[in-house]
Amino acid sequence: MTIVADVRPDLMPYYKEDCDPKNLAPLWEVLHTFARKTPKSDCQPYIWHYNEIRDTLMKSADLITAEQAERRVLILENPGMRGRYRVTTSLFAGLQLIMPGEIAPAHRHTQAALRFIVEGSGAYTAVDGEKTYMEEGDFVITPSWTWHDHGNESDQPMVWLDGLDVPLVETLDTTFAEPYPEKNQSGTRPSGDSLARYGMGLAPVDYEPQSPNSPIFNYPYARTREALETMRKTEEWDACHGLKLRYVNPDNGKAAMPTIGTFMQLLPKGFETATYQSTDATVFSVVEGSGKSIIGDQTFEWSKRDHFVVPCWVPQRHIANEDAVLFSFSDRPVQQTLGLWRENRGNA
C-alpha cells in the first residue's frame, strides 16, 4: 500500500462527485458538527404569557369542536424550530382546551403524554377504564399505548398543558396510533382506584409491576403543595433550585414516566437561584406567584399560568418576587438512562 505524501485538495470536488451517486459522504467535512466542545441546539429561550394567548385559545372553540379536532390544542412552538411542532428538540408541548359538555374521543398511541392542569376544575381524563377528575396544579399521566379520553362535566372551560415525547418517538421511528372503537371508554374501575391502590405507601399483596410507568396516573396538587409547605420548615434551600421535588414511580423510585421527567419546585419570596446549566432542555409552567428568569442573556418576567422554555446547557437563574411554585418537565430520564445527562451548578 502506497502512503501518499502530498495530498491534492484541489481534486476533492471530483472525489465528492464520485461519492454522491454511491450514497457516500466524507466524514471529515462534517466531523466538527458531531464532536463539539459544548452542545448546540436550535431550541431558543421563549415565554408564552397566558394573558396574551388565552383569548386566542378560547377562540378556537368557535372554530372547531373537541370531537372534530380529536385534540383541540395550540402548540407551544419553539421560535427556533418553527414548523417542526416541538418546544424542545425532543419534546412537544401545547395547551389543550375542553369546553363544558365536550368529549375528546378515546385513542391510544406510542407517545407518552402528561397533562398539567392550568385552568378550571372538574373535567376528567380516563386512562384504561379509570376516570380521574382534575384540579388546577394536578399532574396526570397517560402512558404509552394506554387508552385515554377527556371530558368536561363542569360549567367552565378547562385548560391544561400537554407534554409529549412525540419528537423522540419520531426519531426512533416507533410511532403507532389507534382509535378506540367507541367515542369514549366504559368505566371499569372507580375514580381514584389507582391512587388508593398504589399511592398511599401500600400496594396489593400480590402486585407485581408490569410497566416502567407509574401505576398512579393522577398526582394531586393538594398533596404536592402540602409536601412543599411542610419541607420548607427545615429551611434547607438548594442554591440552584430552592426546594425542588421530582414526581416518582412508587414501584421503583424512578421518574413517573420513563421518557419525561417531571418536577415541582418552590422559590420563597426574594429567593435568587445560583446560575445553573443542564443538558435537559426544560419547559416550565408557573403554578403560583411571580418572578423573573435570566436565561442566557435574556430576562423573562413571569406570573401565574405563564410557560417558558430553557434550552439545553443555557445558563439560567430564577428570582421570585413572592412565593412562587413552578412545575417543569424535560427528557432527563432518557439522558440519565443513556449516561448522557450532566449539569453545571455554577457558583453554588
Describe each model-derived feature in a short phrase.
Residues M1-T89, Q185-T259, F263:
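A short, N-terminal "cap"/entry segment at the start of jelly-roll beta-barrel domains
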Residues M99-E136, P143-T146, G151, Q277-K304:
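A short beta-strand-loop-beta hairpin characteristic of the jelly-roll/cupin
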Residues V127, Y133-S154, W160-D165, I295, ...:
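Conserved metal-binding segment of the jelly-roll/cupin
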Residues M81-F92, M99-L114, G129, N252-G261, ...:
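A short beta-loop-beta micro-motif enriched in histidine and acidic residues
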Residues G80, L97-E102, T110, V118-S121, ...:
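Short, flexible loop/turn elements at secondary-structure junctions
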Residues H148-D149, L168-E170, K254, K269, ...:
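Flexible loop/turn segments at secondary-structure boundaries
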Residues L267, D280-S290, T299-P311, V325-F327, ...:
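Active/binding-pocket-proximal capping segment
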Residues M1-L11, Y15, E153-P212, F217, ...:
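Double-stranded beta-helix
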